[in-house]
Amino acid sequence: MEQATQQIAISDAAQAHFRKLLDTQEEGTNIRIFVVNPGTPNAECGVSYCPPNAVEESDIEMKYNTFSAFIDEVSLPFLEEAEIDYVTEELGAQLTLKAPNAKMRKVADDAPLIERVEYVIQTQINPQLANHGGRITLIEITEDGYAVLQFGGGCNGCSMVDVTLKDGVEKQLVSLFPNELKGAKDITEHQRGEHSYY
């Protein structure tokens, strides 16, 4: 079993919360952090108990003050830059797990432009659009520097698409890739088709 070179950031409050939960379990139990459907739009992160007999040879161990976290090797790259916190609010406390790379593993700075733009869409833009039930797909980047996008989900047939494209998505992409992208174009036909909401 390997020791991890990079830790997942678990706040002191979250570590104390895990320790309290682990104290009720069989001795030697730790936690497991994992991603279901990693690298897809449906990726979901989770934390579970990891009794001693559930540790796999290929697991990566991250040691914290009072426990260890085990991560399977498939989930590991998708948990890069992940953060776990335990937030107390008026209505109670809850564990938060942010994993910006769960849906798509991080791409290198020198990766082809289309891969870097796709990464930004999946990790930054689509999570915002998901609040409205929408999503965008990158179709291609034209030779003259335009990202061609397809809107889907709740965005399809929505009259706000032009505003969303121009004000939100295009601005965000151009500001992140100022020397490489001139703008964004939409290939979705925004006539009200039978799949659209009225």
From Swiss-Prot:
Its cofactor is [4Fe-4S] cluster. Keywords: 4Fe-4S, Iron, Iron-sulfur, Metal-binding. One of its GO terms (molecular function) is iron ion binding. GO terms for biological process: iron-sulfur cluster assembly; protein maturation. Belongs to the NfuA family. Involved in iron-sulfur cluster biogenesis. Binds a 4Fe-4S cluster, can transfer this cluster to apoproteins, and thereby intervenes in the maturation of Fe/S proteins. Could also act as a scaffold/chaperone for damaged Fe/S proteins. Homodimer. HAMAP family: Fe_S_biogen_NfuA. This is Fe/S biogenesis protein NfuA. It comes from Haemophilus influenzae (strain PittEE). The lineage of its organism: Bacteria, Pseudomonadati, Pseudomonadota, Gammaproteobacteria, Pasteurellales. The gene is nfuA.
